[in-house]
């Protein structure tokens, strides 16, 4: 029996609440597909500051090093806002983990469910064609990490990418497309940026190893427009750090709720950190109304990308789709009639059990 070690870092706010539901789903799905999990929990973020004085302790980092993947909740809250910026939970936990494990690829799915078209700001005639997009963003290079200077009269930032950096993120995008609709858009600004010209040259060479993938090019300004005008044309969007940062947030706005958005950050060894895209929402942390779907979908991403358990991941995604189609929703999706956090998790679990028995 295959066994997977997972570092469980629930964090702050709603993190522990929604993490409980994700672990419940993972435990069942592992039994169905005959593999096992070893869940090792540790404090991170504000909870770690309160316990150890730092947002990421050496013990927690060591636990992560001994694991096959990290399932991350959320960190931060007003309680720690008085700390220096570089010591706050958000800055002092997640960013060091990304750097330590060289998590260079960020994957952000965006799917608009048929039962949730009312929650999207897009018109029905746009959504009805289907919206299911994966934004693949390079996370450790580009303009955020280049040389910069801020003077009194001028300032500059430098966008630098190497061939190797582009190649490895391109492989992630093409491999992802293979288990989706086999289409990749490279998002760039090759009409004015030298770095974008290099991206096109390198990606055009990498795609030769993926004859089954359809590669297209699109300028980033046009891509920003097409996301709201004709999003169904996209499958996988391959982006540099800056462009991916902007477009992934635009994608987050069109699906209707942060409670549905999952995220994966990967290195070249298949190790990943999986987390909801939303925040810790401390204002509702003790109300049992947080949407656990983003955390559960993050767990499904872990199954898919770190453990290659694609069918198990698909089962979870299908169960979520069915639950939503049945009108089972949390308060962020339907304020008039809603399930609590644990009830939503139970609903998804019951659908998985019914399909298993069927």
Curated annotation (Swiss-Prot):
One of its GO terms (molecular function) is magnesium ion binding. SUPFAM superfamilies: Isocitrate/Isopropylmalate dehydrogenase-like. It is found in: Cytoplasm. One of its GO terms (cellular component) is cytosol. Mg(2+) binds at residues 221, 245, 249. It is an enzyme of class 1 (oxidoreductase). Pfam families: Iso_dh. Its EC number is 1.1.1.85. Pathway: Amino-acid biosynthesis; L-leucine biosynthesis; L-leucine from 3-methyl-2-oxobutanoate: step 3/4. Substrate binds at residues 98, 108, 137, 221. InterPro entries: IsoCit/isopropylmalate_DH_CS, IsoPropMal-DH-like_dom, Isopropylmalate_DH. It catalyses: (2R,3S)-3-isopropylmalate + NAD(+) = 4-methyl-2-oxopentanoate + CO2 + NADH. The record marks 144, 189 as: Important for catalysis. Gene3D superfamilies: Isopropylmalate Dehydrogenase. NCBIfam families: leuB. Homodimer. Belongs to the isocitrate and isopropylmalate dehydrogenases family. LeuB type 1 subfamily. Catalyzes the oxidation of 3-carboxy-2-hydroxy-4-methylpentanoate (3-isopropylmalate) to 3-carboxy-4-methyl-2-oxopentanoate. The product decarboxylates to 4-methyl-2 oxopentanoate. This is 3-isopropylmalate dehydrogenase. The lineage of its organism: Bacteria, Pseudomonadati, Campylobacterota, Epsilonproteobacteria, Campylobacterales. The gene is leuB.
């Amino acid at each position: 029996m295959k066994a997977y070690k997972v570092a469980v870092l629930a964090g702050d706010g709603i993190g522990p609440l929604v993490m409980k539901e994700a672990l419940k789903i993972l435990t069942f799905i592992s039994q169905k597909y005959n593999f096992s999990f070893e869940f090792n929990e540790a404090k991170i973020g504000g909870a770690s500051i309160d316990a150890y004085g730092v947002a990421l302790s050496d013990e927690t980092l060591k636990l992560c090093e001994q694991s096959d993947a990290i399932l991350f909740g959320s960190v931060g809250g007003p309680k720690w806002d008085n700390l220096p910026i570089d010591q706050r939970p958000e800055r002092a936990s997640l960013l060091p983990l990304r750097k330590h494990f060289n998590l260079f690829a960020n994957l952000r799915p965006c799917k608009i469910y048929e039962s949730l078209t009312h929650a999207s700001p897009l018109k029905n005639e746009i959504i009805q064609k289907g919206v299911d997009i994966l934004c693949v963003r390079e996370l450790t290079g580009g303009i955020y990490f280049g040389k910069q200077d801020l003077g009194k009269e001028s300032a500059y930032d430098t966008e630098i990418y190497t061939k190797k950096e582009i190649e490895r993120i391109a492989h992630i995008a093409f491999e992802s497309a293979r288990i989706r609709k086999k289409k990749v858009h490279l998002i760039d600004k090759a009409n004015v940026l030298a770095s974008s010209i290099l991206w096109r040259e390198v990606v055009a060479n990498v795609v030769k190893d993926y004859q089954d993938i359809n590669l297209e090019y699109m300028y980033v300004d046009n891509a920003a427009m097409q996301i709201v005008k004709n999003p169904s044309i996209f499958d996988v969007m391959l982006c540099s750090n800056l462009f991916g940062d902007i477009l992934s947030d635009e994608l987050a706005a069109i699906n209707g709720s942060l409670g549905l958005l999952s995220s994966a950050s990967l290195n070249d060894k298949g190790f990943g950190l999986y987390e909801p895209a939303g925040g810790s929402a401390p204002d509702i942390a003790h109300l049992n109304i947080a949407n656990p779907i983003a955390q559960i979908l993050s767990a499904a991403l872990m199954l898919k990308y770190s453990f290659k358990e694609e069918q198990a991941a698909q089962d979870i995604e299908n169960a979520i789709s069915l639950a939503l189609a049945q009108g089972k929703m949390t308060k962020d999706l339907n304020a008039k009639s809603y399930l609590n956090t644990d009830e939503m998790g139970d609903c998804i679990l019951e659908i998985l059990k019914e399909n298993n028995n069927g």
